[in-house]
Amino acid sequence: MPEQRLRIAIQKKGRLSEDTVKLLKACGVKVNLNTQRLIAHSDNMAIDILRVRDDDIPGLIMDGVVDLGFIGQNVLEEENMMRTVAKEPTAHKVVKELAFGACRFSIAVDQDFDYQGAKSLANLRIATTYVHILKRFMEEQNIPYTSCMLTGSVEVAPRAGLADAICDLVSTGATLEANGLKEVEVIYRSTAVLIQRADPLNQQKQDLVNRLLTRIDGVQSAKECKYIMLHAPTANLEAIKSLLPGSEQPTVMQLSGSSDHVALHVVSKENLFWETMEQLKTLGASSILVLPIEKMME
């Protein structure tokens, strides 16, 4: 029955969309998203994927139209503030912070601008898509300004004479530099999150959500971990174990045909640097392998 299928909203295009699709596939959700269809159905789970504009996702969650949504915190925060002003529903639950979509929301000015702190922004005209987040910051700083609402290409506003400064998302800063701007004030930091509608789901849907969250945990944990395998002389076993970074107690196995060497296997949440590998080698370790982990369940 359609009402028993979990409805998940994702951004229809862009980097966040690509990362979300990769995550869903890594979680074992089989769905064909290669076509331009706005709704896609999973082949192996009771899940429907709705591809929509990113700024529509919070509203779909808050209005109870969909069950889950993958969204940037910046978009969620802006929509939440806008709906609060309009006295529209804002209830939702953030159920998982995700390991992608990290960016910052910053004010940028012309590279020649003599910036002496936030007070230098007084009485400037600032172009932005996120008027409410900007407004909150400027009011907290007690700085008068004029807002210029733009829905795209915010970075060209100063050159076009539309604004004195901008407030926009920044990942690397390359776009700002290309447009003769410099970042002067970070006012908000964002990452991707998974949000859920506030009203309770039926048991079948909630069970599916719980399964999905467990798989997301497994995928994200696996990305942060490495599987380390090596052969070690028993005479230096404790010294070698002490060099393995951030690990639980390793699995130690006797090597076939050898009484003075063992195999060590361990999952590490820290990188094994070349210097450490060289130290291990000095202690007699051999066949040292550091492997990525695709999936993990603790």
UniProtKB/Swiss-Prot annotation:
Coiled coil: none annotated. The gene is hisG. This is ATP phosphoribosyltransferase. Its cofactor is Mg(2+). It is found in: Cytoplasm. One of its GO terms (cellular component) is cytoplasm. Catalyzes the condensation of ATP and 5-phosphoribose 1-diphosphate to form N'-(5'-phosphoribosyl)-ATP (PR-ATP). Has a crucial role in the pathway because the rate of histidine biosynthesis seems to be controlled primarily by regulation of HisG enzymatic activity. InterPro entries: ATP-PRT_HisG_long, ATP_PRibTrfase_cat, ATP_PRibTrfase_CS, ATP_PRibTrfase_HisG, HisG_C, N-reg_PII-like_a/b, N-reg_PII/ATP_PRibTrfase_C. GO terms for molecular function: ATP binding; ATP phosphoribosyltransferase activity; magnesium ion binding. GO terms for biological process: L-histidine biosynthetic process. Pathway: Amino-acid biosynthesis; L-histidine biosynthesis; L-histidine from 5-phospho-alpha-D-ribose 1-diphosphate: step 1/9. It is an enzyme of class 2 (transferase). HAMAP family: HisG_Long (MF_00079). Belongs to the ATP phosphoribosyltransferase family. Long subfamily. It catalyses: 1-(5-phospho-beta-D-ribosyl)-ATP + diphosphate = 5-phospho-alpha-D-ribose 1-diphosphate + ATP. It comes from Psychromonas ingrahamii (strain DSM 17664 / CCUG 51855 / 37). Keywords: Amino-acid biosynthesis, ATP-binding, Cytoplasm, Glycosyltransferase, Histidine biosynthesis, Magnesium, Metal-binding, Nucleotide-binding, Transferase. Its EC number is 2.4.2.17. Feedback inhibited by histidine.
